[in-house]
Amino acid sequence: MEKPRQGFWGLWNISFGFFGIQVGFALQNANMSRVFQTLGASMDDLPALWVAAPLTGLIVQPIIGHLSDRTWNRLGRRRPYFLTGAIMAAIALFLMPLAPTIAAPLVFAAAMLWVLDASLNISMEPFRAFVGDMLRTDQHAAGYAVQTAFIGAGAVLGSIFPWLLEHLGVDNVAPEGALPNTVRYAFWFGAVAILVAVVWTVFTTREYSPEEQAAFSGHVAADDDGEIIARLAAKKPLGGIAWIVAGVIVALAVDLLGLQKEVLLLGALLAIYGVLDIVAIRMARRGTKPNMLSSIVGDFSGMPPVMKRLALVQFFSWSALFIMWINTTPVVTQYVFGSTDTASAAYNEGANWVNVLFTVYNGVAAVAALVLLPWLSRRFGPVRTHSICLTLGALGFLGFFFLRDANALIVCEIGIGIAWASILAMPYAILASNLPQAKLGIYMGLFNIFIVVPQLLVATVMGSIMLAFFPGEPVWTMLFAAAAWAVAALAMTRVSAAIPARTA
């Protein structure tokens, strides 16, 4: 038995919630550096303040993936998590603009970023698996393309909203230490947008029950919990010990090499995973029943080959994206608009231009997902399509390094937008057709590790590199971003060899 084929409105309803989620992400990505700098953070403080975002994704997504694979109640399998995350994100978006009125505004803003990113991840992670749950294999590419179009459209609205408010007469400049009304109102609008969009998907879709999913044909078989326990029991703890040693080496390198203290977080995460790996092995050898830890550790160590090779691509792809989100505002305001004074009209004009630039790349992504990517995929296949798009994005980052004209940067954003569309669609379409249906949640959550880890590296190591070699010159980060996407494009050549000749 095959799943029913979804028409236009079916595809629309399945992914519309992502529109609201991406409004929230866009407001976060385009405005949080501005918020932090306005509240007194220096350029060197930004990576540490941003570290909350990837860290929450690293923790939240595998857990939510595991839980959603095993959830079934009146709301369904994935929808309970959509709704919970949307409510929490709306609260964080509402409270964020109140930071200047709090006794410790910078700490409060960082805490709200943590809550916001965790909440958006709670909503976002099940949406990735939701497309695979609801669609037959031959509609996976179309489903993720529609999802990407909504991501682009939501990001366009979230990115452009402060700029639109300014042109409607809302104040874009505020006293020192206060947020402009354009930013405040944009965050409150985002709170409403995410609730409305997610509620739409929750109430216009019906998830297939576990029994219905089991009856559908054409899905890759999943390892059962017993096989995972047996695989863990057969493992040696040397791998966990190696992770712990790596964490200790990273921690020692902080003092030896004079790295920023945020790098300690990376060392701690490596050591913690090593400990969890050893604990999971011991529990398996004792005959402990399958649990969340054994599932996450076991599935991580037993990833299918195609997922392992795509993980390398994701690592370099998201390194560049996080560099862009942190540094575009400082680069544009300093090099194009000539100001680092957050209370100046020039700085705020440049910060709003960043919203326009982010609107362009997200708008391009929305169009490319529906028009360009399907054409390229039919002509060259999904693997070569992704490689081509990443190359175009790398050229866009090079433009930021060399160009000093605000309008010329729009051309750069076209290449970045095409690459962004492909990053959001192609890897997930490939995975959804080659992973066990019953484990889409946990595998999509684990795949997020290779989105989060590079962001943590950027948030910790990049600050040390810039401080040591390019102090006060954030434009060099764009060269790092270009190199990262060039490496990702080359890494895609290894992916095709891991895709089975016959997919389910």
Where are the predicted features?
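C-terminal transmembrane helical hairpin of 12-TM major facilitator-type secondary transporters
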Residues: 384-426
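Hydrophobic core of transmembrane alpha-helices in multi-pass small-molecule transporters
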Residues: 92-123, 408-422
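Helix-to-loop junctions at the C-terminal end of transmembrane segments
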Residues: 59-75, 368-382, 466
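Intracellular loop-helix junctions on the cytosolic face of multi-pass helical membrane proteins
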Residues: 1-7, 100, 104-108, 123, ...
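C-terminal ends and interior cores of transmembrane alpha-helices
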Residues: 82-103, 391-404
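Loop-to-transmembrane helix entry/capping segments in MFS-fold secondary transporters
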Residues: 43-44, 137-146, 351, 435-447
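Intracellular juxtamembrane helix-capping segments at the cytosolic ends
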Residues: 122-135, 422-436
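Helix-loop boundary and gating motifs at the non-cytosolic
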Residues: 2-56, 309-313, 317-341
